[in-house]
Amino acid sequence: MTRVLYIEGSSNKAYSASIEVCDAFLDAYRQAHPDHEIRKLDIWDLAMPEFDGAALAAKYAGLSGTALTQEQAAAWQQIERLAAPFHEADKFLFGVPLWNFSIPYKLKHLIDVISQKDVLFTFDGTGFTGKLAGKKAAVVYARGLAYQSPGSFTPAAEFDLQRPYMETWLKFVGVTDITGIVVERTLFGPDGKVDRSRAIDEARTIARTF
């Protein structure tokens, strides 16, 4: 069975533009693919370990080929459990609001914890190889201001570290089939509603053939 993993990145549950667009995407996806399974991963409900102590020691033990202690092995198993949904899924949908030019710290925390050698990537003398190759991703980017629209008063190339980061990370772990859906000006009242409506329509169209 084809599985979709929806990673919900917004903590603003009632008013989130990224959640609204993702919900529209998923509704259209379900209609087009009724036999596919959709799983939701809300990073705000996810217990994640600090990457220190035993986990950090386990990382370097793995890099050096040293056997793990019992404590290190337990810490590493927790990391592998957090990464398991990404291996089990065939497709990903990310809802990513812009926070301080980048992504929410909870999403960054998850990425930092699970992006480990032999978990999401491998490397040898020829370079890095992502372990999620063959999967595809759709990413909904929500921004309060206009970063890509004509007349934007933000220098997008400098201020937008949201989309470049997500696409770099996805490619690093092997996901090269990436579709981006951008909803901007979410703080702009009526203008923001126009942008949100456009993004919802775009999401529905993309979802039908995703």
What are these regions (language model features)?
Residues 1-105, 112-116, 201-210:
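N-terminal beta1-alpha1-beta2 submodule of the flavodoxin-like/Rossmannoid cofactor-binding fold
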Residues 49-55, 151-153, 192-194:
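Short aromatic-enriched loop/helix-cap "lid" or pocket-rim segments at secondary-structure transitions
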Residues 3, 37, 136-137, 176-177:
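Residues at the starts of beta-strands that form the adenosine-phosphate
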Residues 71-164:
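Helix-loop-strand module that forms the ligand-binding subsite of alpha/beta enzymes
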